[in-house]
């Protein structure tokens, strides 16, 4: 059904500042094809669009599964408990910009309702729930996968009728030491490099509010 991630929709208070921040992050001014900075008029919340091969057919199937979508040319989008979700049928996106940290490793969502977010991602969009884990420090995480995209959901101990939200992006780098050195030369504030929760990973937090969402770099050894 879903073939790949089309784009991530981010709500940015200042578009020019956000563009500059992502140019610093990637080390290039070339726009990232999977980032939509600023919400379109049909998106009331940040969220995700997914690429499909037969938009009318998949839209009907998703609608039957309980997610009502509205057509916008080559898109069909809707709202799901605080997230904008949608489908797109259009030519394959251009390659990510030629930077050292410009590939999306995974997305992070917040949700107060385990069953509801599973129904949204698995029941309506066809994701697989790969891992349901309670960390030793008390954080409950769900990990989903679909067409190469990993989505991590952090379950919040809030009112279960409250909204879900797009919370953060992890960007893959082949050499986190080199990426951090480049960013520090560009006056970007970073955390120290540390071991990630996943064995064999190292991560660093990028402390730049103009990126609009919490952002980390991750290296997989």
How would you label these PLM feature ranges?
Residues 1-14, 37-113, 133, 137, ...:
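Vicinal oxygen chelate
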